[in-house]
């Protein structure tokens, strides 16, 4: 059920009303943000990343501080939105929120590991926010070690917090654009459709065409092909 009645309820209450009618399972809300506000925090950022599973391309993170009184309608975990809806929400978030997007490169993924690279991207996104937040809601079960702002890790946070959901949308849209651009430079892998994830087309192209500079050599399917060569 899509929360179409936001205007009637008012932005801060919209998602809670939708959750109540849908059994409380379908949409993120402002519960975590409001709990942080109750503890005295005023500038709360949601942080999320995308691109941990692909065989190619960077990992991308976004940090978003929402105006809790002026929320875009229909915010949800980016994975639960259609590409068209994500694309429509991106400019709405950018117009109404403070945000930053950052990346960790394929080289950094291979040098460190995908978890550390994901945290690097998160750290960079948070550092780029101006003004800085005073509290962070971070998707996942770990807090990046270089973040020195009070924070909490939120498992499946993009389905629980509207701020994290907004970050997931910006990160997804930004990374998808990168992969579309790379697909034009390196045709045949289907990156414009699979975003670097190991689809059949991508795996077949790795065997037939080979490994590009944008592939993650530390990932087993890529490493295996390089080793065979």
UniProtKB/Swiss-Prot annotation:
<feature type="binding site">
    <location>
        <position position="48"/>
    </location>
    <ligand>
        <name>a divalent metal cation</name>
    </ligand>
</feature>
<dbReference type="GO" id="GO:0003723">
    <property type="term" value="F:RNA binding"/>
</dbReference>
<dbReference type="InterPro" id="IPR012337">
    <property type="entry name" value="RNaseH-like_sf"/>
</dbReference>
<keyword id="KW-0464">Manganese</keyword>
<keyword id="KW-0255">Endonuclease</keyword>
<dbReference type="GO" id="GO:0043137">
    <property type="term" value="P:DNA replication, removal of RNA primer"/>
</dbReference>
<keyword id="KW-0963">Cytoplasm</keyword>
<feature type="domain" description="RNase H type-2">
    <location>
        <begin position="42"/>
        <end position="229"/>
    </location>
</feature>
<feature type="binding site">
    <location>
        <position position="139"/>
    </location>
    <ligand>
        <name>a divalent metal cation</name>
    </ligand>
</feature>
<dbReference type="GO" id="GO:0004523">
    <property type="term" value="F:RNA-DNA hybrid ribonuclease activity"/>
</dbReference>
<comment type="function">
    <text>Endonuclease that specifically degrades the RNA of RNA-DNA hybrids.</text>
</comment>
<dbReference type="GO" id="GO:0032299">
    <property type="term" value="C:ribonuclease H2 complex"/>
</dbReference>
<comment type="similarity">
    <text>Belongs to the RNase HII family.</text>
</comment>
<dbReference type="InterPro" id="IPR001352">
    <property type="entry name" value="RNase_HII/HIII"/>
</dbReference>
<dbReference type="GO" id="GO:0006298">
    <property type="term" value="P:mismatch repair"/>
</dbReference>
<keyword id="KW-0540">Nuclease</keyword>
<dbReference type="InterPro" id="IPR024567">
    <property type="entry name" value="RNase_HII/HIII_dom"/>
</dbReference>
<keyword id="KW-0479">Metal-binding</keyword>
<feature type="binding site">
    <location>
        <position position="49"/>
    </location>
    <ligand>
        <name>a divalent metal cation</name>
    </ligand>
</feature>
<dbReference type="InterPro" id="IPR036397">
    <property type="entry name" value="RNaseH_sf"/>
</dbReference>
<dbReference type="Pfam" id="PF01351">
    <property type="entry name" value="RNase_HII"/>
</dbReference>
<dbReference type="GO" id="GO:0005737">
    <property type="term" value="C:cytoplasm"/>
</dbReference>
<dbReference type="InterPro" id="IPR022898">
    <property type="entry name" value="RNase_HII"/>
</dbReference>
<dbReference type="GO" id="GO:0030145">
    <property type="term" value="F:manganese ion binding"/>
</dbReference>
<protein>
    <recommendedName>
        <fullName>Ribonuclease HII</fullName>
        <ecNumber>3.1.26.4</ecNumber>
    </recommendedName>
</protein>
<keyword id="KW-0378">Hydrolase</keyword>
